[in-house]
Amino acid sequence: MRSRVPRKEIKSLAFALYDTGETILGALVVSTFFPLFITKHIDVKIYSLSYGISLLASFALAIFLGKLADENALRKKFFTLFSLLTSLFLSSIALLYGTPYLALLSFLLMLISHQQAMVFYNSLLLNFENKGFASGLGVSFGYVGSAIALIFLADKLKEPEVYAVVGLIFLILAVPSIITLENPEISAKISLKEIFGDRTFLLFLLSLLTLTEVANTLIAMMGVYLREVYSLESVEIYRIIGFSALGGVLGGIFWGVLTDKLNVNRVFPLGFFLWSFFFILLFFAKKDYLIFVGLLAGFSLAHLWSTSRVYILENFPKESVSVRMSFLSLTERVASSFGLFLWSFFLFITQDNFRLSALLMGTLPLIGFFIYLKTKLD
């Protein structure tokens, strides 16, 4: 008798493949090709302002659509719609390449669609029995997707076809989720006033912000830190970042399995101490131990991305999952800006002492832990 793969494993794989496509899109288009292209034709300030406005518009739309989806059980339909629109707007950039302002408009519409898709994508975890494993596997596949994008695709793809190719890759990797993932049928009347007034939820988001701030700062500044503190060459920096990706792959699986076995309420708080330990280690680390530091960086990032969305699913009303996931998305966006602002401030007050500035960043997770404790007391 032919053995069959259990359905929950198929669903987990489909979920992870979507994460792969999402990270390929982010690594190749959002972070690399499009910014380099558009800033040759449009003032950087206009691009930055447009990008920021699109994120605010995306959050406002996510709140509205999230409420609509939660009240009418439309999460899967919105996930499918915005996944298809993401691919469409991304591919359209190739056709509009000769008219930069129209290309920018298509890019911004792609960003907004992508953010909506991610909100409803995270909401679909609601139906998983093995939420931790599915989330962690998605994180692991995301790291693999980034590696594939930067190592194998970045040098081979050229503009403008890169946008059509990545749009197609994203669509192909989204299809398994569109076909196999089920719509959570939970629905209820949603009060935005109650959610905005949910003290426990807002305190959790604030505690989470302390982690996402240090995580996004690490992603943005790790290469610069290694160059300034250890005088590493580019090849050595790439090697350490590569080991960080390996730590992310291993960490996604590890934290996902641990979350299912121990419960996310036990696993998530470990992140506050994990990140503080990382920055203490970074302060004292000698050059010979940087590979281990890189592994720990990826391992810590994997913990954050694997557990945060599961924590929301398990600790707050499931009827309002889409609205709450839109707040998770906003937290990640805010952290990208505020974390870098704080890093710059620490460099300023320490007179460009990178080691000490990193150590100061390590105090944020400890502050976050005390905020998190307030959620339990409440």
From Swiss-Prot:
Disulfide bonds: none annotated. Keywords: Cell membrane, Membrane, Transmembrane, Transmembrane helix. It is a multi-pass membrane protein. It is found in: Cell membrane. InterPro entries: ATG22/LtaA_families, MFS, MFS_dom, MFS_trans_sf. One of its GO terms (cellular component) is plasma membrane. One of its GO terms (molecular function) is transmembrane transporter activity. Pfam families: MFS_1. Its main location: membrane. The chain crosses the membrane at residues 12-34, 44-66, 92-112, 132-154, 161-180, 200-222, 235-257, 267-285, 290-312, 327-349, 356-373. This is Uncharacterized protein aq_1569. It comes from Aquifex aeolicus (strain VF5).
